[in-house]
Amino acid sequence: MAEAAAAPISPWTMAATIQAMERKIESQAARLLSLEGRTGMAEKKLADCEKTAVEFGNQLEGKWAVLGTLLQEYGLLQRRLENVENLLRNRNFWILRLPPGSKGEAPKEWGKLDEWQKELYKHVMRGNYETLVSLDYAISKPEVLSQIEQGKEPCSWRRAGPKVPDVPVDPSPGSGPPVPAPDLLMQIKQEGELQLQEQQALGVEAWAAGQPDIGEEPWGLSQLDSGAGDVSTDAASGVHANFSTTIPPTSWQADLPPHHPSSACSDGTLKLSTAASTEADVKIVIKTEVQEEEVVATPVHPTDLEAHGTLFGPGQATRFFPSPVQEGAWESQGSSFPSQDPVLGLREPARPERDLGDPTPTVPQDETSPGDWLFGGVRWGWNFRCKPPAGLNPRTGPEGLPFSSSDNGEAVLDPGQAPRPFNDPCKYPGRTKGFGHKPGLKKHPAAPPGGRPFTCATCGKSFQLQVSLSAHQRSCGGQPDGVPGAAGSARDGSGLRCGECGRCFTRPAHLIRHRMLHTGERPFPCTECEKRFTERSKLIDHYRTHTGVRPFTCTVCGKSFIRKDHLRKHQRNHAAGAKPARGQPLPPLPAVPPDPFKSPAAKGPLAPTDLVTDWTCGLSVLGPTDGGDL
């Protein structure tokens, strides 16, 4: 036995035993870590439970407080109900007669009271209010009492209003305002119908007897006084003075049936109905006619006609507005109209005369101008909002003769002499460019007969305008010809000249970019590599080589590009019929691609987004998120 116990243990056995112990220790450590994690989670849940319990306790306390308040109010209501029941059961109630002011109305002579009288009245009203509240009388605090306590004067407009008689109501238990009794409503309705019939029968006879026959001819300028432009109003009655001869005052001061206002006839003029309205309605009609008279007395500039073209129809202004030929106001179009808005009455400075140099055609005296002169064409009298009459050419006029220009004899419509129908742009003789307004036409000269008369003495390049030649000479190194004081001035480009090579520039940014070539400065470094660039746009294009973003995609073959000019070059290859890249079949192209600008009828009206898409040929815009310029 001793020999067996003293036998040495082999090292392999020891190693196996140690490894087994290590594995056991590791498993125990893992269990310990898991227990620690579970303990932490349990502690966290316990803390959350405690927090929730505290919040629930706070909410419960608030609920208990609200419940206690409700119980107290319920006890008060129950006691008041018991008191009312005892009074009704014992018939121990009385009628309380209160002095004036108990219902919250202020005395009529409040402004004549002294301070001590007002203070006494305030105390009396407060005592009455407290007495009513102590007797369980459901009443709110009077508004007049609140105003008096705040030191304000009681509102007098409430006292001046008509008194509304008390109407018996049905004590319906449902919610909502009290509703008058049905029998009273029927009685009021029947009495109102009878009174209305009597007033109509009497009022029509009185009105027809005292008024002239105005149904045949509407109120026009012929029925007004000669001083149509002078507006005079009676301060007492508010009636226009010019209508004293047309409408006798005694005719409309009689009792007239109500609810019959003046009506507008189909021809655009105002007529009074036979069953006319009350005195206030007649005054309204007269004021309306005065406003129209003011419109007649004020001339309107032709450029302001389009804004007011919808007030009357094509033939409805003849009765209100005189013909300019008949009144002698048909002057040459070179004179400026005093611009005043007929509706708002806003005056603008007089427009200057035309300075285009073309002759101003005048209208012959035998040419009759149509009636709708104000809201139609200044020369021919048709409405701008509607189509011109049959046989009238908006480009030629009523006689069929176009207005000729002194430059080349081309028949055009002078935009300064008549408003432009259908939003046509102004065009100058010999030029294809159109302008939407007259100032742009003035700034754009006619095409010179020589083509390009302005030639640079340094390089021999020709230009159409002297301004273009001056800008070119600043970059070419020469001086503008024919400009007084050009040498040594600030416009000769001496301030934008490079000191290294002597080159001139028209903009400071171009000079700064040029100087970077001499100094070697590259202020835009790449954060991914060591390259630097002189322009931010080039740095953005370089970033796309790192990110792999190709925002410009060809709509024909689907190929993407980093730069926009690469896409344009690729699209030019498609347009020229070049073969596609290897492995990329080219889909069939349409024989004639539609042009939305030249053939809008083939494609229909385009939205602004469609026009932008067709114009850019599917180019996508590079935004700030993709690295584009802001």
Swiss-Prot record:
Listed Basic and acidic residues bias regions: 348-357
The keyword Phosphoprotein appears for this protein: no
Major localization class: cytoplasm
Cross-link Glycyl lysine isopeptide (Lys-Gly) (interchain with G-Cter in SUMO2): residue positions: 283, 287
PROSITE patterns: KRAB, ZINC_FINGER_C2H2_1, ZINC_FINGER_C2H2_2
Compartments, record wording: Cytoplasm; Nucleus
UniProt keyword annotation of Zinc present: yes
Keyword field: Coiled coil, Cytoplasm, DNA-binding, Isopeptide bond, Metal-binding, Nucleus, Repeat, Repressor, Transcription, Transcription regulation, Ubl conjugation, Zinc, Zinc-finger
Post-translational modification: Ubiquitinated by PRKN. 'Lys-48'-linked polyubiquitination by PRKN leads to degradation by the proteasome and may play a key role in regulation of neuron death.
Family: Belongs to the krueppel C2H2-type zinc-finger protein family.
Protein name: Zinc finger protein 746
Organism of derivation: Bos taurus
Taxonomic path: Eukaryota, Metazoa, Chordata, Craniata, Vertebrata
Name of the gene: ZNF746
